[in-house]
């Protein structure tokens, strides 16, 4: 301790010692203050904070509590950092040397004090180092990128517009709107906090006060922002938070992050924080203690797996310098394109080549006929386009023969060279080819051939008389012929079907008036596509009465093109009708889940064999007898039931949910009906709507077993096929573990049955699976809660790495989500449950940094083929595909991207 004369030289009378040890630093709980109080409390003193760790002690802080001015505060953070590194100023050096003799006494005092008090409960897995805390301090933000960062000129402009009728005063209720903040509740609390800090009274502010408020909001200094945040709940400014204020801060954060479950459980979580920071039941906690808990690093339930050096090397490899030679850049780009798309390239080349060959053949054939002398090149073009139309009208049916494609991709090796994943896209490309062909064919006839026939003289027309009959001068006679009527009819019907099949109409993206809106959507697309029954009938008739051909019907080629595809497609439809009606399925369980999702558990027919990632069609005759809708199967192949999760969006799904919701409603007490739609607990068999299924059908995600490492990405309801894959991996892990246990048993060692070749081919290959599920609603995590918990219980070898992202929560590092992050770590450490998802899997906030995700996988798995499987909205497809190609080109890891048609 300093003697009195030494203290007087510095201008102070007493010294108060505060110690920091591993017990009270960020590695455990709140600070513990040990006071050496040799004189009266009213006399001046100096506070010295000592950092005691094992046998080492260092000065951590120095200040005069009785002198709060800027000149008397020695606890500047930069000064302390210098002091700890040997670069302190003279005052700190003198104090450090003077107190060195009292360090041992203080340390022993702290140890004895700690021994007398009951130890605070230690939370396993809650750890932070000072470096991580400093990073958190620098990165913590108060306002997100979308709230309040529009810039002062915009805020000022809005202020003047909003205060035109209020004499230049902005009311408290419109403060959030003025600064561009969406959360009204958060904006009101922010206004009150800033008003207290700036000593502003009343519920209105002028432009100068708003500018001061704006400076506080946009201040990049962490301390200022954190003080503002705590001022929002510490309304009496005493530096203490009681349980009610802690509850308010939790409610405030939950409201800003749209987390209704946390808001409803605010009392429980407030009690949890008080239990941690107020073990002696003083009834309050200090704000600085809550700051320590806020800075706890979120627990990581996964291993990073890469070092800084590897990460740096990879970053350097990804920065490929651009060649100045345009030829070299073009060649490299073409090389990458062919390498990534060679399956699509050869299929498209074959298709385009076939069309070009047919067009050229017919063009040259009619170039030599007498019709060329009358109608010229127009008839050659019309007949060439007609031949391509025959091919395309036949081929467009093949990509939608789902049973055939499923059999080919599952039972044959053709998937190695044929891009079955692009079957629907190829269907659309052929439709475009048909549109172009129809345009050329119809225009050539209507705008060129018919006018030339009318204008031809008798000698020119004579060779055409055997095809068209006596010459007519009326244009309408050609249009009203069988060929003309059937052709125009096909064009009209195809135009309707093609238009309603476009994304704008099929997904109701156009803002149409009420009456017109009813003729758009999936139902309009579904029913309009059935017009092709009429189209193909007209096509056969049109081909029978085709112009310029008078041979018998069996020598005409239209029916030859169509016969095989049409018969194949009709067989597909018959198989669907037969398969769905032979063995009916019963509903085992129904649940209406948060986020407008209907979960159905159905009995599994004995002959229904499928793979994870595949889908099936559902039909509910109570809604519509004709409509069949595809849904991914969420159960695993090893389960004894079938499950689907249906997002309620369109008319059909809304009616389906309404029907099942009626079944789930509780009956009056006298009817003795249990309030749950689970057949295992029913007192009687409920009257569920009849469900028919058809499938399974192949999908891109079913190929996950071809890869040892897979990256599964699901957006919202797009997680459904990925959940089936995760469940399948769990079942396989259980099977491998059970097999290992059997081999280790003495009985198994006595008799070991041989493994068949088929069993060897089905060996489980997946060694690592990364699952990223991104959803906006917190309630979405309830959909697959059981699966998430099962992963944490079963996956002892860490094969599956789960990442749940809730985008409604502000990004990590924002003050409004800092409370959620702290609460998340605290609750998970104590109860093993994540407060956001309600599962044992820790959730992340905002959206993933996909480049970092790919970078991490590339570092962890060099020279490996990684299967990337995505299902969700189309907005993310481009980014994931680009990253897959980019990392495949620039690293030794090859990412193979698969997109589910969603």
Curated annotation (Swiss-Prot):
Its EC number is 1.11.1.-, 1.6.3.-. Ca(2+) binds at residues 234, 236, 238, 240, 245. Residues 63-87, 107-130, 738-760 are annotated as: Disordered. This is Respiratory burst oxidase homolog protein A. Residues 74-87 have a biased composition (Polar residues). Pfam families: FAD_binding_8 (PF08022), Ferric_reduct (PF01794), NAD_binding_6 (PF08030), NADPH_Ox (PF08414). Residues 575-703 form the FAD-binding FR-type domain. Residues 366-380, 450-484, 551-709 are extracellular. Residues 221-256, 265-300 form the EF-hand domain. The modification Phosphoserine is found at residues 311, 315. The gene is RBOHA. It comes from Arabidopsis thaliana (Mouse-ear cress). The chain crosses the membrane at residues 345-365, 381-401, 429-449, 485-505, 530-550, 710-730. Monomer and homodimer. Residues 1-344, 402-428, 506-529, 731-902 are cytoplasmic.
